[in-house]
């Protein structure tokens, strides 16, 4: 089973899995929805293959009295499944090959700001799942039985204590909601708000920058190797420093992901005894 990583800094993760048919004749309970999401996560952990896709990122910083900073980056994004040394678990690793920065060839392959988000595909932001019930409070929004095609909406908020925080995927007090497609029981949209988020960690004698983070993720079904997985199609983030700060600053990030493909390893034999190319 893939290792699930804690939700740290700007990380965000994927909710994927096999389509599971909703029960049309019976309104699901909160417990049943959590069970379905746990099954989706387990399917993702064990079945999602290594993939690559087109990534388009717009990163901005807006500060009062200063010109805006804008960076547009186009890359080939890769999500690679790496087995552990003992072959018992796997970890999903993010890689990217930057193709252009602001329309020009890149001078380096390290993505830079002004605003960054990492870890979006790396593991286990299971905010709506059975294994996070000790860390979260869940509320199922009232379901309109006359509109069976409307998404189920689950609201959540963290319940962090000194005893449970170490095992919680959300390490900062946060709240949000997810929208779940009733036909497939897959999450199609995630909203997360963290009122006091560490935007920039402390460095030496410089205090950290604390502020509000608002994060949204949209998911879409993608066929990979004959199986359907719900992958991020759009990720947006809006950070603002605390209102008491002298210079109000906003950090914005928007990434779109298109043209997903399963990674394939091919080998061909070259004439003359040359080594095969992989």
For the regions a language model picked out, list residue spans one by one.
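Structured extracytoplasmic
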Residues: 23-175, 182-189, 193-278
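Bacterial N-terminal signal peptides
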Residues: 6-18
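N-terminal secretory signal peptides that target proteins for export/translocation
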Residues: 1-4
